[in-house]
Amino acid sequence: LFSDHQMETVWGMHNWPGLPAGEIAVSEGASMASADHFEMTVTGRGGHAAMPHQGIDPVLAAAHIVQALQMLVSRHTNPQDSSVLSITTIHGGSAFNVIPDEVTLGGTVRAFRPETRARLEQSLRDVSRLTAESHGCTVALDWRQGYPPTVNHQAEAIRAADVARAVVGADRVHMNPEPSMGAEDFAFMLEAKPGAYIWLGAGETEVGRMLHNTGYDFNDEILPTGTSYWATLVESELAAK
C-alpha cells in the first residue's frame, strides 16, 4: 500500500459501544493491545484409563500447562504493565475409558509494550515445554504473531482531538481513555506512518451484544458525527499545507 501510494499520515476511526453516542475518545499513545495467538499439541502415550501407569497422560500434562501459564501475567508481569493470556480451546480424547495420545490447546496473548509481548511469547514456550517434560510428555507449539499494539503518534493525536472538539465540542472529547485489550489491524499502518486512531461513541448496547457479537446493532445516528469528523479533518489538513 505505502509503496504504491505516497502518504504522509494515516487516520482511523472505530465506533465504540459504551462511550456516549456522538462523543469522541483520543489517545496520545497506545489505545489497543497487540494480539497473538497460539496452538500447542501435548503428546504422551495413550492407554487404558484403568491402567494409567502404563501410559503417559497428556490430559494431566495439559491441565498443568494451563494452570502454569496463568502465572506469566499474574506473577511474572508488572501489574501496571497490562497484558492478558487466555486459554480458549482444549481438546483431547473421545472415549471415557481411554487415555489419548495427545491433547491440543490454544489461546491468545495481548500486551501493549513490544518487550512484554516478546517476553510472554518466550516464557510461554519455556513453561509449556518444561511442564510437559515434567510429565514425560512433549509439546509442539505453533505461535502466530498477529496485530501489533495500536499506538497513536502524539502530534497527530493532538490534531485529531482538535478536529473532534470543533465537531462535537470540547466537553464531548475524552483524552487518553483507558486502553482496550482488543486489537486492531490499523496498528500496522501506524507502525509505517504517523497518524491517529479514534473511537466514536455509539452509546449503550443491549447487554451481551458488544462488538463482534452476532446480535450487535450499529447505531446509525452517529453517522453524521463520523462523516463530519472526516470532512473537518480533511479541511484542516489541507489548510495546513
Task: For every predicted segment, state its role.
Residues 1-89, 94-100, 183-184:
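Histidine/acidic-residue-rich, glycine-tolerant segments that coordinate divalent metal ions
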Residues 60-241:
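Metal-dependent amide/peptide-bond hydrolase catalytic core
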